[in-house]
Amino acid sequence: MEMAREDERKTALVTAIGSFSAREVIAGCRREGMRIIGCDIYPAEWVADSADVDVCYRAPYATDETAYCAFLAEVCEKEHVDFVLPLTDVEVDVLQKWRMESMDATKESEVTAEFAPLHAVLCMSGVETIRLCRDKEKMQNFLSERGLCRTIPGRELAEVVEAEAGSGYENLSYPLVIKPVDGRSSQGLARVK
């Protein structure tokens, strides 16, 4: 049985409130008159912005997808959350996967207003936009084709190995920098000398 909502304001769940963007997201929700629930992997007393939310929860790591999704569902139900605002790539990736698993495969690019498992709106880009943004090669091609900005030239490692094997790799300009196509920040970055 669902309990009645005591506070009639819309409620936003802001994740990763210890991240760089949290302060501005919280301030924006506050300007809109929202009740704000925050969560982070660290205890509230370690997170400065926890003082700026109405309620703060300690979240499991998003890399533990099952625990993280169960946590979000529990908080959304308990706090009557209307909007979920994920702030880190890893959280967006987990929610994207969950959203895809919950959608009808024939309607892959359709995003409904409310994400049924949470009974809340996921405040994140659509499926195709996230796919584009999370793939460095696709994003480079997208930007280059439209002349939107200069990008750092990149090639797939397998393509480089195949093209340069006959020359003993002497035609390459070293050091090479390699990164996973879906990496974030500098995770997985390596220099080849």
Q: How does the language model describe each region?
A:
Residues 1-123:
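ATP-binding N-terminal substructure of ATP-dependent carboxylate-amine bond-forming enzymes
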Residues 1, 126-127, 193:
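Short intrinsically disordered, low-complexity coil segments enriched in acidic
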Residues 89, 127, 181:
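Histidine-centered beta-alpha loop that forms part of the nucleotide-sugar donor binding/catalytic region
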Residues 123-124, 178:
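General beta-strand structural signal in soluble alpha/beta enzymes
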Residues 103, 130-193:
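Active-site nucleotide/adenylate-binding loops and adjacent lid/helix of ATP-dependent enzymes
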Residues 20, 62-63, 127-132, 157:
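Short histidine/acidic/glycine/proline-rich micro-motifs that form metal-
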